[in-house]
């Protein structure tokens, strides 16, 4: 009986324990932690000053009781700690960055990573937008930044980096719309004095080149002039005005043989008020109210004068910057359809590195692709002597280098090179290292006009092809402006300049040029040496890689060959310019 009683008590206690009767322990349901947090928009690009569409979270698992974010969201944006919704109006331009949102409850948490970019407020596509990019020169630059070399008056590695990084920022200013026109300083109108000589101002063209290649233009390409081909390129207008009068030497600028009113650039000295005439007259965009994005690249002296004169001539009475503010500032006169104008100022806040741009590897050639030639041929009879009256230089080497890729089809041309060519141009310092060591570098004056394709263009691509090389090697770039390249006498006059007079005796010269002009130059030189049968071969239109070498030895004997090449595989270059 006693054992049965105790058994009953034990069973009763067990029952009470598990059923919760009598105030004993109860069962507890443990909540789950949240999981799989995500947002409606994981990668967001916002505009400064424009309210965003609220970005809402979703998650699975347990209910979320609080949200937090790290680091803090861009100024003007907030995260609701109770709902996790991101909302607000961005108050400042912010570079692309990652933000981690944490959703929590009492038993755990989960995270999601968002990428947010806040871009500038773009200019209105309904307005006439005159956009001024201030290039640096020796007089107006931030000395602490070191963007301009005091010995070459050219950009430094850091200045080149800034120009490459400025291009996508300028795209944001345009609201990612295509540019309508680009106008740059005519380099020979602004010679800058350095300890080693007076050199043309190429910074304005180089500053805007990457931006030009991020735009596109469609041009006729077939013989009928109707079929359109679109390329990653945009023409840079940097030619002399119709009223331009070449200064007397120095510097000597040949009177232009071809004028292209639509190709006019900016004159540093604003000769005859040509800069204002370009904007208010030649373009005709203000009077006719032609909306678009018109970009001007020039140093502060030219830019500030042009801003002031446009404001005065058009009666805008704008409050303009009183002094140079640095290379990161961009100014825009935005003219509404009503005719009212406002000045919009942008600051890119760029802080580029001081090293040469690091690029992905480009496709290389294992061997030079051109069919070899040499004049005189190996083992031939001794070369003939120079003609009477022709006194050649001695101990001189000149490398003939073609511009970068420029023709997506054979007859397509805009005076510039295309996006693929930027890979070659930027890679030249590496590609040519150990192959050549020039003491001087020359190219065609980009203000000269080339008749190509179905129009006329400023011929900027040879000089811009070699610009990265001279920047990387801290060499000045000389512009050959004293001969009009399309004159019938151009080959003879060019040879006289480079191969006689002893100016280049003992020198090694890199000459960036037009490939169709090299054979006539060599043939004219061969005639000066009384060659009667041997001539230079044609340079193939699809060959951007070969280098011709002209050598004058210690007594002036001539040899010409094409044994060298840059070694870059043109066919494998990306169609779009590299973006850093």
Q: Where are the regions that the model predicts?
A:
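Bacterial Sec-dependent N-terminal signal peptides
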Residues: 9, 15-38, 115-123
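A short beta-strand segment in extracellular, disulfide-stabilized domains
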Residues: 49-59
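Strand-loop-strand motifs at the edges of beta-sheets in extracellular beta-sandwich domains
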Residues: 75-91
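Exposed beta-strand face motif in extracellular beta-rich ectodomains
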Residues: 95-99, 507
């Amino acid at each position: 009986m006693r054992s049965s009683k105790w058994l009953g008590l034990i069973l009763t206690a067990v029952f009470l324990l598990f059923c919760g009767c009598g105030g004993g322990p109860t069962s507890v349901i443990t909540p789950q932690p949240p999981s799989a947090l995500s947002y409606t928009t994981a990668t967001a690009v916002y505009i400064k000053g424009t309210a965003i569409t609220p970005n809402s979270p979703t998650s699975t698992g347990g209910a979320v009781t609080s949200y937090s974010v790290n680091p803090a969201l861009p100024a003007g944006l907030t995260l609701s700690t109770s709902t996790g919704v991101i909302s607000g109006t961005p108050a400042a331009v912010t570079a692309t960055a990652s933000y981690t949102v944490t959703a929590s409850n009492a038993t755990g948490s989960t995270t999601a990573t968002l990428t947010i970019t806040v871009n500038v407020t773009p200019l209105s596509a309904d307005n006439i937008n005159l956009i001024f990019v201030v290039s640096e020169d020796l007089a107006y630059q931030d000395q602490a930044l070191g963007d301009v070399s005091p010995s070459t008056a050219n950009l430094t590695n850091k200045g080149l980096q800034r120009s490459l990084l400025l291009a996508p920022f300028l795209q944001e200013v345009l609201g990612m719309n295509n540019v309508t026109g680009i106008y740059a300083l005519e380099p020979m109108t602004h010679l800058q004095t350095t300890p080693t000589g007076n050199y043309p101002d190429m910074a304005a063209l180089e500053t805007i080149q990457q931006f030009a290649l991020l735009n596109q233009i469609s041009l006729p390409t077939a013989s009928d002039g109707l079929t359109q081909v679109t390329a990653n390129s945009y023409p840079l207008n940097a030619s002399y005005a119709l009223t331009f009068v070449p200064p007397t030497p120095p510097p000597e600028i040949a009177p232009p043989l071809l004028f292209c009113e639509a190709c006019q650039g900016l004159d540093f000295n604003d000769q005859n008020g040509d800069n204002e005439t370009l904007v208010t007259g030649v373009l005709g965009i203000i009077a006719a109210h032609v909306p678009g994005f018109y970009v001007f690249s020039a140093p502060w002296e030219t830019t500030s004068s042009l801003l002031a004169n446009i404001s005065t001539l058009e009666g805008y009475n704008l409050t303009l910057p009183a002094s140079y503010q640095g290379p990161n500032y961009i100014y825009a006169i935005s003219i509404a359809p009503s005719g009212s104008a406002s000045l919009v100022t942008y600051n890119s806040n760029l802080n580029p590195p001081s090293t040469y741009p690091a690029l992905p590897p480009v496709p290389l050639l294992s061997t030079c692709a051109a069919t070899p030639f040499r004049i005189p041929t190996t083992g031939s009879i001794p070369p003939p002597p120079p003609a009477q009256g022709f006194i050649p230089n001695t101990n001189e080497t000149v490398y003939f280098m073609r511009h970068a890729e420029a023709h997506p089809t054979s007859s397509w041309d805009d005076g510039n090179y295309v996006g693929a060519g930027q890979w070659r141009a930027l890679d030249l310092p590496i590609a040519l290292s150990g192959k050549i060591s020039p003491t001087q570098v020359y190219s065609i004056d980009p203000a000269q006009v080339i008749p190509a394709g179905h129009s006329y263009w400023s011929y900027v691509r040879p000089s811009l092809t070699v610009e990265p090389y001279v920047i990387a090697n801290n060499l000045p770039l000389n512009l050959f402006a004293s001969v009009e390249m399309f004159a019938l006498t151009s080959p003879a006059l060019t040879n006289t300049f480079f191969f006689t007079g002893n100016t280049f005796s003992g020198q090694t010269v890199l000459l960036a040029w037009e490939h169709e002009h090299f054979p006539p130059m060599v043939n004219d030189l061969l005639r000066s040496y009384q060659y009667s049968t041997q001539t230079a071969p044609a340079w193939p239109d699809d060959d951007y890689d070969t280098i011709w070498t002209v050598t004058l030895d210690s007594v002036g004997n001539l040899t010409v060959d094409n044994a060298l090449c840059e070694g870059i595989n043109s066919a494998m270059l990306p169609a779009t310019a590299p973006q850093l």
